């Protein structure tokens, strides 16, 4: 098993990152370089989280071997009180040979740092640029990142001056490398504590509230009202941008030098707008150089950037609205089925996606009723209690991990108890669960961040390139300080434990933080205690209340604005539900009509074809007799009678449903004129 566990986890983490990227990104529409860069960033960050427990177990085994081979006096001063030297050290099942982990961590760490500080910011500006050529986009990206890179050089220069002025230090390459790592980890730890303080409280509370059916339904109504406002704003913004594009397209003719730029902008517009602009454009009129009303290339670049953003935002709000409708309909079905006497879950609308036959066989309506109406609320409550216990352990350990005698950090206590018995499976599971919980608290907060609709991770392939690159950049900055904080909680970091024990391979590549004592002995130890204040603020929803006072509507049960938005969202859901029910009723009527009269029409057509074949054969055998005109007259009369039968209206005829069917409108068969075309559609104003 030497190195096998490392190889299996490398493969598993790759497919995990690929699955998550497929859920949020769009492989077909987005650029390949964006997909590859984001996948690499997510993959490297997830690798650190999954491989670090293996590094901890291997380090504990190596410490045991050193303790056994050393003298008793040295073993007494070691990190853990060990048994006599006669005791044999057991090799862990996931043991990684010496020399592999340092190289592995060095490649992973420096690649992720190159992505987060150099490549991904440049690709962000490149993807957001509205230039029409590669050179123009690169120029825009360099200009935007000049201030960005200058800020980092200023911070690094400040650290460098501090070390150069201090006479205790002799500047060497390793120390310069340590200064750069310390600067990056300091910035990451500053943001990490803010996100962690929110996630430690919000994740258990969200699962506890998930057991409240009425709470989830009211919150869904609230989201519907806010999303409808955003959806209307996105549609209005798109209309304004498309109007500007139309004016530009009409002013710049086919032989204008900037016409290629206009064509590039038109390709980014929705299909219906492209067709509308194509009908209104007159390419036969030449442009006049004497006119001064033509837009410049700089204005076209700005317009191109606005088109990309508005189209993507409009598409995202449309998809999110459909997803929110499905969620609201399902929660309303759960509320109705809770009082069902049959104990079988009944859906108002059938799922539009085809269900798996295996899942459909086991997940019957009865099983679904017991899970949704009885078991799921209790499962969410138990899960919320477990997550709350984890949060308490993490908060206590963050406040006490600097104490080594006695050891107060609960995470360090659990690891040291397992270390004495060499229970490597327990050590790896405890390390993995702890760092996985920390990652969930931080990463889930990252996925929920929404900065003025400019950066937003949306599922169902609706995340734009800029947000994907920003998330990869943020992950690469947060993961290294997160892992260092975890090693501090377990006292595996020599800077925290104040011992000469063998460090982990991950800690060894970071260098000794003693070069910057005010960071190693001050910021890294006392700043994580701020998580207590952030948890208290999150528990009392101070941030939510402040945003609500600033005008950003948040879901608060005691707010009058929240009640108004809930009522508005409930009315919106009711209208959409009625519209969908009418659509399904129309489809059911069409289906019944086809089943009732489809066979009769087919038999009539077969009879007519057989009659025409007999008449044509009779006319061929009697070519000298003038009977062909009578045969044609009879055939035409028969065809007219059949067409009248086909065009007859059934008793439950609905003109709206028939005209909305694309199959009927595009079939190309004969459609009668007269009063049937002039009849107005029924129920045309019901949705107003």
Swiss-Prot record:
Q: What is its main location?
A: membrane
Where do the coiled-coil regions begin and end? 222-254
Give compartment(s): Cell membrane
Which InterPro entries does UniProt cross-reference here?
GPCR-associated_LMBR1 (IPR051584), LMBR1-like_membr_prot (IPR006876)
Basic and acidic residues biased stretches: 600-617, 635-644
Chain positions covered by the region annotation Disordered: 600-673
- Cytoplasmic-side segments: 22-32, 121-144, 202-381, 448-467, 537-688
Which residues are modified by glycosylation? 76
Q: Which residues lie on this side of the membrane: Extracellular?
A: 1-3, 54-99, 166-180, 403-426, 489-515
Quick check: keyword Oxidoreductase in the entry? no
GO CC, sorted alphabetically, is: membrane; plasma membrane
- Annotated membrane-spanning segments are 4-21, 33-53, 100-120, 145-165, 181-201, 382-402, 427-447, 468-488, 516-536
The protein's topology relative to the membrane is: Multi-pass membrane protein
Q: Which UniProt keywords apply?
A: Cell membrane, Coiled coil, Glycoprotein, Membrane, Transmembrane, Transmembrane helix
Q: Does the keyword Transmembrane apply?
A: yes
* Record field: compositional bias (Polar residues): 618-634
Task: Report the function annotation for this chain.
Answer: May associate with G-protein coupled receptors and regulate downstream signaling pathways.
**Record-given protein name:** G-protein coupled receptor-associated protein LMBRD2
